[in-house]
Swiss-Prot record:
Part of the 50S ribosomal subunit; part of the 5S rRNA/L5/L18/L25 subcomplex. Contacts the 5S rRNA and the P site tRNA. Forms a bridge to the 30S subunit in the 70S ribosome. Keywords: Ribonucleoprotein, Ribosomal protein, RNA-binding, rRNA-binding, tRNA-binding. GO terms for molecular function: rRNA binding; structural constituent of ribosome; tRNA binding. The gene is rplE. This is one of the proteins that bind and probably mediate the attachment of the 5S RNA into the large ribosomal subunit, where it forms part of the central protuberance. In the 70S ribosome it contacts protein S13 of the 30S subunit (bridge B1b), connecting the 2 subunits; this bridge is implicated in subunit movement. Contacts the P site tRNA; the 5S rRNA and some of its associated proteins might help stabilize positioning of ribosome-bound tRNAs. One of its GO terms (cellular component) is ribonucleoprotein complex. HAMAP family: Ribosomal_uL5_B (MF_01333_B). One of its GO terms (biological process) is translation. Belongs to the universal ribosomal protein uL5 family. The keyword RNA-binding applies. The lineage of its organism: Bacteria, Pseudomonadati, Campylobacterota, Epsilonproteobacteria, Campylobacterales. It comes from Sulfurimonas denitrificans (strain ATCC 33889 / DSM 1251). The keyword RNA-binding applies. This is Large ribosomal subunit protein uL5. It comes from the Bacteria.
């Protein structure tokens, strides 16, 4: 079993007591993690899109998929059918393994890291934040990267409020910044 899942099961009762939840089934839990890269800068270069897809697949441990434009938008020089991004959705064991690597290995490698911002919650207990580069993950070698790009990570929880989502992620080891940003 994943180390982070064991940690969650150990702190579930404590989290339930802290939030004043009577039914243990209402205790917030991680549902999925979505990693996405908007690759508008690489629309015309299929090799670069493939490289981004391979990098995200390596980071996530699961095959990433290319996002295709549904409509043409002249202002962005996007045509219907063009690749505009890459994403992967993690659930279950792979989700817990990725979260563990993110919190314990990747985020501490960010230059001048002072914690992830607290204002990334959406009002329903889900958390979004961005990373500036993919090289903070130990799985990615510098030689295999064609272009440095960032990514957006969405952590979807079963929490019904931001307070419950924050409590869950904080107890699971997410390094939030100290300020009230």
């Amino acid at each position: 079993m994943a180390r982070m899942k064991d940690k969650y099961l150990a702190l579930k009762a404590e989290l339930q007591a802290d939030l004043g939840i009577k039914n243990p089934m209402q205790t917030p839990a991680l549902e999925k993690i979505v990693i996405s890269v908007g690759a508008g800068f690489a629309m015309k270069d299929n090799k670069l899109i493939q490289n981004i897809e391979d990098t995200i697949t390596t980071i996530a441990g699961q095959k990433a998929s290319t996002v295709i434009a549904k409509k043409s938008v002249a202002g962005f020089k996007v045509r219907e059918g063009m690749p505009v991004g890459v994403r992967v959705t993690l659930r279950g064991e792979k989700m817990y393994n990725f979260f563990d690597r993110l919190v314990s290995m990747a985020l501490p490698r960010v230059k001048d890291f002072r914690g992830v911002p607290r204002n990334g919650f959406d009002g329903r207990g889900n958390y979004n934040f961005g990373l500036q580069e993919q090289l903070i993950f130990p799985e990615v070698s510098y030689d295999s990267v064609m272009q440095i790009h960032g990514m957006n990570i969405t952590v979807v929880t079963s929490a019904e409020s931001d307070k419950a989502g924050f409590a869950l992620l904080e107890k699971m080891g997410m390094p939030f910044s100290k300020g009230s940003n």
